Every structure is written in structure tokens, then in C-alpha cells.
Amino acid sequence: MTYDFDQIIDRCQTESSKWHQYDSDILPLPVADMDFVSPEPVIRALRERVEHGVFGYGTLRPEFYDVLLAHLKTRYNWKISAESIVILPGVIAGFNLACRAMAQSGGGLLQLTPLYPPMLRAPGNVGLQGHQVTLTQQANGHYTIDFDAFEAAIQPHTRVFMLCNPHNPIGRVFQCHELERLADICLQHNLDICADEIHCDILFDHHVHVPIATLDAAVADRTITLMSPSKTYNLAGLHCAFAIIANAALRERFIAQRLDLVHRMVNILGYTAMLAAYRDGQEWLNQVLRYLQANRETVEAYVKSHLPGVIMYAPEGTYLAWLDCRRARIPGGDPHAFFLRQARVALNNGLDFGVDGAGFVRLNFACPKVRLINALDRMRDALQC
């Protein structure tokens, strides 16, 4: 079937976190979910499950593992065992559990910044010391990794590197040679790797996602990979995710940390949606990726032509645009407050992603094009005043 992503869907009365927190005259483009209807096979599967009417405790059918293993093999040529999969209610719970499983209180954790705020908070949540390495921004907005700085930041007590790939908020899809260099440094310094790869299916311009655990067996042995259908198929409110942990001892430590804190099974509707999405959601994904790529190109062209002083490097993955507003001569130097007040457009504050995000905002372009253009027009008009 053909999906209509231009359709305007009113989410205001649906307890949407994105739409509920702002006044009705504000266009919200912050929180990373889509303003699109999810795949029809997912909706159909949920409808059938709801009509059954019984919502007791669930378990995983063998078909689930078959579908998930086939998905990983098809998309990433990644062959794993069913035993390596651990079901979770979300990736945030996953990387907090990974911190507990991989390091003891007082240990160090390494991150590349700017970075998704819950990842920045994770070390403090579990008594670890966070060490941030700033990604290097080129004149055109493109970010690269300073590998010398990365290695120099490793301390004797550092135990974990927390990777975000595709990277939120900058939109980099790290190439194989970059991942190999990071992994080599981690192995040389005896670091485990926690990889948040939740945006792995949202890719543009023939970029290819390489799960870091697929590099070789030694890397896989020290890695916890976290994935979810939530970004890919717009299922964030259903809380369904999974970890892939090849090392049995590490997997047991991870499972032990969730005991009686994080349930071993996702909710029954989340499980139903996840199975249907990975089994039958490919056509929807193909179509939404084309729409998102067009939206990304719209934002890129608009920024260059109509938002003076704003720099955007087109994201290689994710549906998030990281806008550098430091040269836009915004009064007070706070683009988040400025666009909210003057343009009535809500974006993510770059400072939430760390001190490296000062003067930046993050814009979510996973919405109907007419809404996106409306927001950009408002931002243009605010800058011209």
C-alpha cells in the first residue's frame, strides 16, 4: 500500500509528550518521534491483539527470534544466536543497566559529545565518573572524531566507552574505519563498549550502518548493543527494545542488574508491535525513508537560503537536524529561547546535549512537509525582525 505522510494528524488530545507541553500556537519539533501513522501491519496486529481482550503476562514465541535474527542478518549481515538477545522496555533502561554490568561504582565511562541527554546522565545514575571527549566540528558543520584526544581521555579507572551510532544529535553514521579505530583503542585499554544503535535504520544517501559488535569476535565479546523498533517504525510509546550480548558472562551480569527492577518481558502490546514491525514493516520503512530524505533536503536548502548565520551539516542518519546558530546574531545567544518566544517553534536546546551544544538547537523533521515549512518560515521571520 501507499502511505500518505503529508496527512496532518492531530495529536493534541492523545497525551503526546511533544504536543502536550506547549501552548496551542507553538509548533513543536523537539522530541524524537514521528508525526506519522505507524505501519498498517503493526496497527492490524495491535487491533487483533486488543480484540482478543486478555492482557495477562506474556512470553516470547519462537517466531519472534526467527524474525529478529532474519532482520539482523538481512540488514547488517549479522549472525547472532537467539540466546544473545535480552528483551527490554527501552534503550535508556538498557544503557543504564549496561553501566552497572560493566563497571563498579567509581569507575570511569567515556563518551563523545555533544550527546543525547539521558546518555550524559547515565554515569551519574550509577556512580560512575563520566569523561567527555568533544567531537571536532569542521567549518561546514561536519563532525569528526579526534582519536588522539579520545585515547588521551582514558584514565586508569576508565572501564566503559558508551557509543551512540548513528549519533544523536549530530546525525553522523560512523564509517567502518572510524569504528575500527575506536574499537582498537578500547581493546588496547581493556574497555567494554555499550553501543546505543537505536537510530540504525534511519539512514540517507547510501550510508550503511555497521554495528560495532560485527567488526570481529573480540569486539563482540566486550560489547552490549542496544536496538529498538521505536525510532524506525514510530513505536516509542509502546516501550519495546532489546540488547544483543554475545558474551555469556557479560549477559548474565546484565540480566542480574535488571532483577526485579526491569521486567524480563516488554508489555504485551509492545511485543506485538515489535514482531509485526520487523516481520511486515519493510514497505512502510522504504516509503518513510524517502519522505524523510526529502524533508532533510528541504531543511538543508532552507537553512542555506533563508536562515542567515545558521549552519547545518545534513545528517547522514536520524531524522534530527543539528543547527549551529552561534553566528546568527540571536539576542542573548540562546536560540532555543529565541525561536520559542519569537517564532513560536519549539526545538531542543543544544545545552541539554552538553556544554558543546551551547548556541545549537536540534530540529526534528519527521513531520508532514507543510508543517516543516511552516516552522522554517516562522524561524526565518523571527531572524529578520
Model-derived features: positions:
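Conserved core segment of the aminotransferase class I/II
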Residues: 44, 221-293, 301-302
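Conserved PLP-anchoring active-site segment centered on the Schiff-base-forming lysine
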Residues: 101-123
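PLP-dependent enzyme catalytic core of the Aspartate aminotransferase-like
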Residues: 329-331, 338-347, 353-385
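Helix C-cap/helix->beta junction micro-motif
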Residues: 126, 188-189, 219, 343
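Active-site phosphate-binding strand-loop segment of PLP-dependent enzymes
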Residues: 137-207
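Conserved glycine-rich beta-strand-loop-beta hairpin in the small C-terminal domain of fold type I
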Residues: 275, 291-300, 312-325
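N-terminal small-domain helix-loop-helix segment of the aminotransferase-like
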Residues: 2-90, 97
